Structures are given as C-alpha cells and as structure tokens.
C-alpha cells in the first residue's frame, strides 16, 4: 500500500506459485487498486501462467481485466471504461551474491493486446501495450558497484486516451526528483546510472 502527496492511494497484492503440481508451469496473480482522491478509482487484475525455460528464465501468457470508475461528475478529463485483453511476456532474473541486491540482472518485457470499452459513450477501441524493464548491477572492484537501469512503456490506440488510463510513474523506484506517481503519459522511457559503495 502506498499513498502519494497528491492524495493518490495505490494498493498492490501479488501471489506466485512457481511449480504447479511439480511441473515447469507456474501461476501468478496480481491485483492493483488505484484511487485518486475523490475523482476516480481503477481496479486491475492480471492472472498469468508461465513456463520455466530454466531456473532463471520464463515466458508467460497473461490476461488483463481492468475497470475504471469516475467518482466526481465534475472531473471531465476521465471516462468510465472496462479493459480486457491477453498478452505475452518474458522474464529473466540472475541472482546476486550480494545480500543487499535483489538480483544481479533482471530483464522483463511484454506485449498486450487490449480491448477498451468506454461505457457511457459505448465506444470500443483496440489497444496495444508494450513494456520493457532492465537492470544490471555491475561490479567495478572491491566494494564499488554501478547500477544500470532502463524502463519504458507505450500505449497505442486510434482513440485518444483519458487521464485515468495513462501510466503513472515518478518517485524513488523510477524517476527520482519527482513525487511518487506524480507524472502520467501514454509513452515514457528513462534510464539511470547509479554509483553504489557498499560499507562493510
């Protein structure tokens, strides 16, 4: 659960079962609820099944079920919508020998084909969604490390997006110097280079 300075509240819940019935098939379920003060609320569920290529790599198939409701009738930048779709993704994680690092290398990218229905206008629109994340902790020598990170995402549609369906980013885990989830766009990318010195 996270609250940002702009009265936005974000709740994430995730469960993962890596080896169903002792097979190489796993299951993942994510639920996200985002509420922006009293203007709108988004609820998203992402059920997924994936296959372990090896102990570091997996490919998966996921569904997207999203519902957004405008809570304030004076909020004209957003619209009520339902979103459904299917997507594929790839994930690679290389573990780290350093306990403070979650991993040495992580690469995740995916594509989703979505159908969005704007309920009050009775408009249906196909959408394409692309996502990429990559991070690498490079050991220079001794206690000196370099963290290299890149992330990007894009929504593509023939219909203009509403404010309540845009990506929200910014903050400690993405663009530092901005408040959490204070930026929104249908396309973003960024890269960062960070020097780290481990004490001890």
Predicted regions and their residues:
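Gram-negative/organellar outer-membrane beta-barrel architecture
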Residues: 1-108, 168-171, 182-185
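C-terminal outer-membrane beta-barrel translocator/porin domains of Gram-negative envelope proteins
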Residues: 86-200
């Amino acid at each position: 659960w996270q609250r940002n300075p702009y009265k936005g509240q974000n709740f994430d819940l995730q469960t993962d079962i890596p080896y169903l019935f002792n097979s190489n098939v796993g299951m993942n379920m994510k639920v996200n609820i985002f509420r922006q003060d009293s203007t709108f609320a988004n609820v998203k569920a992402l059920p997924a099944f994936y296959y372990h290529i090896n102990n570091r790599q997996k490919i998966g198939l996921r569904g997207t079920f999203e519902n957004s409701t405008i809570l304030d009738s004076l909020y004209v930048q957003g619209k009520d919508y339902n979103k459904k779709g299917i997507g594929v993704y790839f994930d690679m994680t290389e573990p780290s020998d350093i306990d403070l690092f979650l991993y040495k290398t992580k690469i995740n990218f995916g594509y989703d084909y979505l159908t969005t229905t704007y309920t009050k206008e009775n408009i249906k629109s196909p959408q394409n969604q692309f996502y990429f994340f990559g991070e690498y902790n490079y050991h220079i020598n001794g206690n000196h490390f370099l963290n290299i990170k890149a992330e990007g995402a894009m929504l593509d549609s023939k219909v203009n997006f509403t404010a309540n369906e845009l990506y929200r980013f910014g903050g400690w885990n993405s663009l530092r110097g901005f408040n959490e989830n204070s930026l929104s766009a249908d396309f973003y990318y960024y890269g960062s280079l960070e020097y780290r010195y481990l004490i001890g």
